[in-house]
Amino acid sequence: MLVKMEIDLAKGFAPWKEMFIQNEHRLNAHGGKLVFAGTPSDNENKLTVIMYFESMESLKNFGSDEELTKTRVEAGAMVETGVMTIMNEASFICTKS
């Protein structure tokens, strides 16, 4: 399942990106994978992330990981501003390699 997350960043994109690179294995351990992460060219404090999760249980496990949430907050993620959208089952990533 694909999930879009939008969240404000207090410290800009660079600290969040570094945090993600160092902790990607934790997302993967929850059955998640990053598809896309980025900010608009005119505002590096508005993050959009697209992730793939194996199941709803995987997504719930990711969301309830308090240690990872603390790490994200330390990198500037303002988790209270987060908006999560579960994408339609017909959504897709790529049709050709």
What is each PLM-predicted segment?
Residues I21-L34, E54-I86:
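An amphipathic, aromatic/His-enriched active-site/gating alpha helix that lines ligand/cofactor pockets
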Residues D42-E44, T85-N88:
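Short alpha-helical linear motifs
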Residues L2-D8, F36-D65:
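Short, well-ordered beta-strand segments in beta-rich or mixed alpha/beta enzyme
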Residues M87-S97:
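Short, low-order "capping/linker" segments at domain edges
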Residues K11-F13, S55-E57, A90:
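Residues that cap or initiate secondary-structure elements
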Residues S41, A75, S91:
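Residue-level detector of flexible, active-site-proximal loop/helix-junction positions
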Residues D8-E18:
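Short, surface-exposed ligand-recognition loops at beta-strand->loop->(often short) alpha-helix junctions
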